[in-house]
Amino acid sequence: MDFITLHNREIALNVAISGKGPLILCVHGWPELSYSWRHQLRYFAERGYTVAAMDVRGYGGSSRPHAVEAYTLRNIAEDVVAVINQIGAGRAILVGHDWGAPIVWTTAVLHPGVVTAVAGLSVPYMPVSNVSFVDSVREIYADRFFYMIYFQAEGVAEAELEADIPASLRKLYFAASGDAPRDVWLKRKPVDAKLLDGMEDPKPYPAWMSTADLDVYVEAFRTSGFRGPINRYRAQRLDPAELAAIKGRPVTQPSCFIAGERDIVRELIPGMDLFTDPGANCTDFRGSFIIPRAGHWVQQEAPAETNAALETFLSGL
C-alpha cells in the first residue's frame, strides 16, 4: 500500500492506494481515517481492483481548513471527484461509512458521470430536504443530550475530546461498537452533559481494534485535533441551501447498504428503525446486508463479513 497526495484546488488530500484495476474509492466517517479501510484495501487489491481510501479534509494527512463552511457535502464531494480524476480512472465505485456514506451518496447524485456504483455503510441514503438532520431532531432531543446538538458550539467538544485523546478514542470506539451495551451511545443524559459522560474505557479492549491500530488513530488526532472532523456536523446546516438543486433526487446508480446489526445509527430517531428500508430512495438498489453482532464500525469489527457483502455487490455490476 502506498500513500499519495492529491489536490482539490488548495486542499491537499492524503490517499492510501493499492492494486491495479477498476477503481474503488473508500471514504471514512467520524472520528476515523483512511486507515479504517485497511482490511478492504488489501482484500480488494488482491482481487483485481485499484482500491483507494482518502483522509477526508480535516483528518489525518489531509488539509484542515478552519472555517465551518469548508466542510459542506458539496465541498467534500468535490474532493472525491478530484481524487477520482487525479488517480486517472475517470470513474469509480464509491464506498462510504458513517459521514462517508452521505458523502458518497451525495457525490453519486451531484456527479453521476464519475460514479459507477455506490455502497453506503451505516447510513442509508436520505435525499436533500429543506432542513438538516440535526435541526430535524432538535424537538425530539429538547430535554436530553444529543451528540450532534452538543457539537454545534464551536470549541466545546474539541476541548473535551482533546483533553485526553487516547482515552477519548478508546471510549468512542467502544461505545458505538457491537461489544458495548446497547444504550451507551444514546444513553439518556441531561442536556448539559458531555459526550464522554457514562462511556466506558474497557480493559481488555475488543480484539478487532489492536493497540497498534489505536495508536494510528491517536497519533493522527494529536496532529489534526478534532475541529475539522466536528465541523462536518456544523456544516450540515448549510447543506440544504447549497444542495437545493438536487433536493429529493434519488441515487440512480447500482447501490447497496451494509451495516452492523447493533449499529447505533438505526436508533438515532427514538422509536424508529432507520435500517427498515435503506433502498427507499435508490432506483437501482441491489440489496441490504445487516451483519449479526457487529456495531457501528462494521468494516473494522467484521471485515470478512463486510468484504463478502461488498464482493457480492460488486459481482453483480
Residues covered by each model-derived region:
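A short loop-to-beta-strand scaffold at the N-terminal edge of the catalytic core in hydrolase folds
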Residues: N8-I17
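Flexible "cap/lid" subdomain of the alpha/beta-hydrolase fold that forms the substrate-access gate
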Residues: L13, Y59-V95, W99-R286
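Conserved HGGG/HGGXW glycine-rich cap/lid loop of the alpha/beta-hydrolase fold
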Residues: A16-S63
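Glycine-rich phosphate-binding loop signature in dinucleotide/nucleotide-binding domains
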Residues: G19, I87-G90, L317
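Conserved Rossmann-like nucleotide-binding pocket used by diverse enzymes
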Residues: C26, A52-D55, V95, A119, ...
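Signature tryptophan residues that serve as conserved aromatic anchors
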Residues: W30, S34-W37, W99, W105, ...
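Catalytic active-site module of serine/aspartate enzymes centered on a nucleophile-bearing elbow/loop
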Residues: T283-L317
